[in-house]
């Protein structure tokens, strides 16, 4: 297995729709199986929660998504490998939350997403997969499928006042918590 290089914002592959993968050939395609293994290793190495094939310079409809348990009010979800994923939103995309991206390092932005959805696609053996996702995992799936359609999270943002560097946003958050603590003491 190998850790793959991650494409950064500005590379044209991130703005192009990815090609569907023939479900009949999934299980018997050693190149695709190696790509999946390499993407799993790359995602783990980067410490991310999702990775789409275009982010590793492969214009294929393939994503990985996970929601680790115990990370700040998040329901956990195991690693999902989805080929040709399709999403059906079951609520309006009006829940705003912070997102980052391995292709846009060190930055975060507030993005509206649906808090719930149904998904279907194929697993790495070519078998159909269906399921439902809520909360953070629904957000991750929407973010990754956007990559397959050539959409970056910044393109979904409504207010660029809520966009900035991680370090700066963490500093502002800490200052706000400290100020709130002082008011509680008064």
Regions found by a protein language model. Give the residues of each.
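Positively charged
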Residues: 1-186
């Amino acid at each position: 297995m190998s850790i793959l290089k991650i494409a950064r914002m500005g590379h044209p592959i991130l703005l192009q729709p990815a090609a569907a993968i023939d479900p009949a050939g999934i299980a018997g395609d050693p190149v695709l199986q190696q790509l999946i293994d390499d993407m799993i290793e790359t995602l783990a190495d980067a410490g991310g929660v999702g990775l789409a094939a275009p982010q590793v310079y492969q214009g294929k409809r393939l994503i990985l998504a996970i929601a680790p348990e115990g990370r700040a009010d998040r329901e956990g979800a195991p690693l999902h490998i989805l080929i040709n994923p399709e999403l059906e939103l079951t609520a309006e995309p009006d829940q705003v939350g912070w997102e980052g991206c391995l292709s846009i390092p060190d930055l975060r932005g507030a993005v509206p997403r649906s808090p719930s959805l149904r998904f279907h696609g194929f697993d790495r053996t070519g078998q159909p997969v269906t399921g439902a996702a809520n909360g953070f995992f629904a957000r991750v799936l929407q973010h990754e499928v956007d990559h397959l359609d050539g959409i970056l999270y910044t393109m979904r943002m409504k207010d660029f006042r809520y966009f900035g560097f991680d370090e700066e946003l963490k500093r502002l958050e800490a200052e706000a918590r400290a100020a709130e603590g002082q008011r509680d003491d008064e």
